Design a protein with these regions (language model features):
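Short, hydrophobic alpha-helical segments
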Residues: 148-157
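Short, amphipathic alpha-helical "lid/cap" segments that border enzyme active or binding sites
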Residues: 137-148
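Short glycine/proline-rich, acidic loop/turn segments that cap or connect secondary-structure elements
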Residues: 110-127
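Short boundary/hinge segments that flank catalytic cores
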Residues: 111-113, 133, 142
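Conserved catalytic-core segment of NTP-binding enzymes
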Residues: 1-109, 122-123
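C-terminal boundary of histidine-terminating zinc-finger modules
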Residues: 125-139
Length: 157
C-alpha cells in the first residue's frame, strides 16, 4: 500500500528493496518489489539488513596470556580459528542467511549490500549521528558508502 501511494504521488527514479534474511520478511518484500515492477518503477537492487552478528574477541589461557592457536566453536554451527594473537571473529546468522541474495536473484538485480547487526551502528543512529558521518573510516561506514555509490551510479550520478 505504501509503495503504491508513493508511486501515485511522486515520480520515482527507482526503488531499493530492503529486507532481512528470514522467510517471513521476504514474503512481504516480494509483494512490494512486484508492485514496483507493475507500476514501472525500476528496482535498483536489494539491501539485506540485520545480516549476521559479528563477534570478535581474544581467548586467554589461565594465566591471562593470549592463546597462540586453537579453535572457537559456538553451538556446533559457528566456528573460527584463533590466530597467533589469540583473536577470533565469528559471524552468527541470527535471522537465517541469504534471503537478500535470493531476492536479488529472483528480481535479476544486484545485492547492493549486507548490513550486519551492530551495536556501533545502533548507538550512532540512536544518537542522531549516523555512523557514515560520525566515523567515515569505520568498516560499517564503508558498507553504507558502497550501497550509496552503487545506487548513484545506477541513477547516472
Amino acid at each position: 500500500d505504501i509503495q503504491l501511494t508513493l508511486t501515485q504521488k511522486i515520480q520515482l527514479s527507482g526503488a531499493v528493496i530492503v529486507t532481512t534474511p528470514q522467510d517471513i520478511a521476504l514474503s512481504d518484500v516480494r509483494k512490494g518489489a512486484d508492485m514496483f515492477r507493475k507500476v514501472n518503477t525500476p528496482v535498483l537492487g536489494v539491501v539485506e539488513n540485520m545480516s549476521g552478528l559479528t563477534l570478535k574477541g581474544t581467548v586467554y589461557d589461565s594465566e591471562k596470556n593470549p592463546l597462540k592457536s586453537g579453535f572457537v566453536e559456538v553451538e556446533e554451527k559457528y566456528n573460527s580459528q584463533i590466530d597467533e594473537n589469540g583473536t577470533f571473529t565469528l559471524i552468527i546468522d541470527l535471522f537465517k542467511k541469504g534471503g537478500g541474495e535470493r531476492e536479488s536473484q529472483r528480481l535479476g538485480v544486484p545485492l547492493l549490500g549486507k548490513i550486519p547487526l551492530s551495536q556501533t551502528i545502533m548507538d550512532s543512529t540512536d544518537a542522531g549521528n549516523p555512523i557514515s558521518f560520525s566515523s567515515p573510516d569505520n568498516p560499517y561506514s564503508e558498507i553504507f558508502s558502497d550501497i550509496v555509490l552503487q545506487i548513484a551510479k545506477d541513477l547516472g550520478h
